[in-house]
């Protein structure tokens, strides 16, 4: 596969104690992608049975072998990321550069309160995912589950239950409350949600899930919305959501 200009390739691996020091399936994934290396390899969820030192050594090995340029974490706690960084410094290994975290209107605390501290202390950035909360933040549900949405796909029963739960209905109501703000900015609620995620300090990119080129282009329109997200607009969004993260100090 040719590396097009501006493209960044990444892979995600899951560690178990038995798989160390070689992350499982990494070479096979590279072969399927027809790539010799990826830009970033993510360690998905810290395995409590795998010593942190061994995980950091394994990721350092991956980079030294030329299989990846950098490594990051996915769904790790701030404490685990800090431990990995400390291990890297102690043993002259390579530390993680970013954390992949869920972030959207209804999942805020980690990206807004925990990761910025790591960004300032050790330079670990954030790559966030699920900006539309698996489709909840699109106003397409409106209290029901359309036949064509992801919630009807096999394996996504949990999403259907989420949509139909009391909490899910409350979140859908908040999405509908945001429609006037989106219209004022000349965008969709989905574009507003993605731009809102991009505004967070330390967030370098937001991962998008699309099923068509048209959907991708629509989501990319959020870049035009980002410049319109003034502090006052963000305050108004926070007031409508009613769930702004606050320091526990």
UniProtKB/Swiss-Prot annotation:
Pfam family, one: Aldo_ket_red
Subcellular location: Cytoplasm
Gene Ontology molecular function terms on file: oxidoreductase activity; voltage-gated potassium channel activity
Tissue-specificity statement: Strong expression in brain, with highest levels in neocortical and allocortical regions, hippocampus, olfactory bulb and cerebellum. Also strong in kidney. Weak expression in lung, skeletal muscle and heart.
Primary residence: cytoplasm
Signal peptide span: none
GO CC annotations on file: cytoplasm; monoatomic ion channel complex
Binding site for NADP(+): 44, 74-75, 100, 129-134, 140, 150, 209, 211, 215, 218
InterPro entries the UniProt entry points to: K_chnl_volt-dep_bsu_KCNAB, K_chnl_volt-dep_bsu_KCNAB-rel, K_chnl_volt-dep_bsu_KCNAB3, NADP_OxRdtase_dom, NADP_OxRdtase_dom_sf
EC number: 1.1.1.-
Enzyme class name: oxidoreductase
Keyword annotations from UniProtKB, A to Z: Cytoplasm, Ion channel, Ion transport, NADP, Oxidoreductase, Potassium, Potassium transport, Transport, Voltage-gated channel
PANTHER family on file: HYPERKINETIC, ISOFORM M, VOLTAGE-GATED POTASSIUM CHANNEL SUBUNIT BETA-3
Family recorded in the similarity comment: Belongs to the shaker potassium channel beta subunit family.
Record's subunit section: Forms heteromultimeric complex with alpha subunits. Interacts with KCNA5 and KCNB2.
Function: Regulatory subunit of the voltage-gated potassium (Kv) channels composed of pore-forming and potassium-conducting alpha subunits and of regulatory beta subunit. The beta-3/KCNAB3 subunit may mediate closure of potassium channels. Enhances the expression of Kv2.2/KCNB2 alpha subunit-containing Kv channels but not Kv2.1/KCNB1. May display nicotinamide adenine dinucleotide phosphate (NADPH)-dependent aldoketoreductase activity. The binding of oxidized and reduced NADP(H) cofactors may be required for the regulation of potassium channel activity.
Protein name: Voltage-gated potassium channel subunit beta-3
Organism: Mus musculus
């Amino acid at each position: 596969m040719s590396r097009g200009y501006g493209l960044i390739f990444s892979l995600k691996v899951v560690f178990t104690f038995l798989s160390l020091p070689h992350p499982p399936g990494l070479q096979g994934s590279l072969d399927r992608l027809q790539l010799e290396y990826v830009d970033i390899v993510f360690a998905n969820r810290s395995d409590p049975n795998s010593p942190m030192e061994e995980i950091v050594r394994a990721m350092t090995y991956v980079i030294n072998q030329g299989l990846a340029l950098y490594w990051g974490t996915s769904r790790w706690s701030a404490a685990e990321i800090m431990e990995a960084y400390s291990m890297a410094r102690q043993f002259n290994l390579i530390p993680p550069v970013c954390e992949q975290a869920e972030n959207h209107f209804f999942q805020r605390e980690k990206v807004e309160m925990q990761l910025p501290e790591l960004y300032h202390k050790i330079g670990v950035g954030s790559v966030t995912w699920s900006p539309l909360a698996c489709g909840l933040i699109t106003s397409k549900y409106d209290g029901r589950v359309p036949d064509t949405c992801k919630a009807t796909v096999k394996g996504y029963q949990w999403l259907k239950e989420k949509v139909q739960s009391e909490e899910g209905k409350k979140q859908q109501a908040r999405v509908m409350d945001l429609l006037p703000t989106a219209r004022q900015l000349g965008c969709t609620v989905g574009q507003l949600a993605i731009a809102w995620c991009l505004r967070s300090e330390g967030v370098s990119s937001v991962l998008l899930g699309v099923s068509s080129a048209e959907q991708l282009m629509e989501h990319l329109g959020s870049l035009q919305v980002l410049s319109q997200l003034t502090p006052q607009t963000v305050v108004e969004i926070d007031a409508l959501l009613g769930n702004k993260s606050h320091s526990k100090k």
